[in-house]
Amino acid sequence: MVTWMLPAGLVASAVVAASSANLGPGFDSIGLALSLCDEIVVETTDSGLVVVVDGEGADQVPMGPEHLVVRAVRRGLQAVGVSAAGLVVRCRNAIPHSRGLGSSAAAVVGGLAVVNGFVAQIDSTPLSNAQLIQLASEFEGHPDNAAAAVLGGAVVSWVDRSYDQPDYCAVPLRLHPDIHLFAAIPEERSSTAESRVLLPARVSHDDARFNVSRAALLVVALTERPDLLMAATEDVLHQPHRASAMSASAEYLRLLRRHNVAATLSGAGPSLIALSTQSELPREAAEYGAANGFIIIKMTAGDEVCWRPEVTVPG
């Protein structure tokens, strides 16, 4: 129930990271924040709604109440028991859309986190990380990207269905310092919903057993034994089924792995994420990617979502 109307003129911001989900076998459970960020700045006003988007998606996303950041801000305000008569929402987007890099999770987590910047100015209690993960995952339907965007770094997430409503949970992992991260981003786009249609409704016991073993090994590889990353990123549940819809990414994935680079689809693709103990990709692999339309970006693990009250509104 709304108990407080925010005054006009309050400003808050959030910076939120991109993320890569699955990392091979960790389907809908393992996520990794990446050092590519969107920034959201929101101001309360006396009435109305204005949405301004710069960068990725500026000509493609809705500019009204359907905008994902707007929906997340309003859901966050509802969760903390406050309201705003009007909003100006400014988004500076660097995370590519529909590429498997968690742009929707970043929008939701950023919108929710902005609310913390508002409640800090009225001496109210901000949303905890657990609440941010829960609310963001309710938008997403799974917690892997949302949890990574909230907590930063690598995470293991799960859904507790012992309650009337799903309880989305996550714990952070300490990513091994010897692991280097590379994203290979194509021009091609793919929506998660479209990609999920390609997945079978049932899998064999052998395939399930294979992925369970690799997902368990992946936690060890990410934290203690990066020399095991090649075996730990093997998957038979989702990537083979998605390959037909993104042939260029599938071919580049095979080439990277032939060069002993632990590459996987990033989320539902078509971007790839590569994890390596080497500081650079093999020359042939890097040249192939560049020649075939992939933008290759060396990254680090992204930070947890950062929110701030009372920032200067950009002109």
From Swiss-Prot:
GO BP of this protein: threonine biosynthetic process
Sequence similarity: Belongs to the GHMP kinase family. Homoserine kinase subfamily.
Catalytic activity: L-homoserine + ATP = O-phospho-L-homoserine + ADP + H(+)
Species: Mycobacterium leprae (strain TN)
EC number: 2.7.1.39
Protein name: Homoserine kinase
Entry annotated with the keyword Transcription regulation: no
UniProt: ATP binding residues: P96, H97, S98, R99, G100, L101, G102, S103, S104, A105, A106
Lineage: Bacteria, Bacillati, Actinomycetota, Actinomycetes, Mycobacteriales
Gene3D superfamilies: 3.30.230.10, GHMP kinase, C-terminal domain
Main location, first listed in the record: cytoplasm
GO molecular function: ATP binding; homoserine kinase activity
Keyword set includes Kinase: yes
Alphabetic keyword roster: Amino-acid biosynthesis, ATP-binding, Cytoplasm, Kinase, Nucleotide-binding, Threonine biosynthesis, Transferase
This protein's pathway: Amino-acid biosynthesis; L-threonine biosynthesis; L-threonine from L-aspartate: step 4/5
Job of this protein: Catalyzes the ATP-dependent phosphorylation of L-homoserine to L-homoserine phosphate.
Entry's Gene Ontology cellular component terms: cytoplasm
Subcellular location: Cytoplasm
A family per Pfam: GHMP_kinases_N
SUPFAM superfamilies, A to Z: GHMP Kinase, C-terminal domain, Ribosomal protein S5 domain 2-like
InterPro entries: GHMP_kinase_C_dom, GHMP_kinase_C_sf, GHMP_kinase_N_dom, GHMP_knse_ATP-bd_CS, Homoserine_kinase, Ribosomal_Su5_D2-typ_SF, Ribsml_uS5_D2-typ_fold_subgr
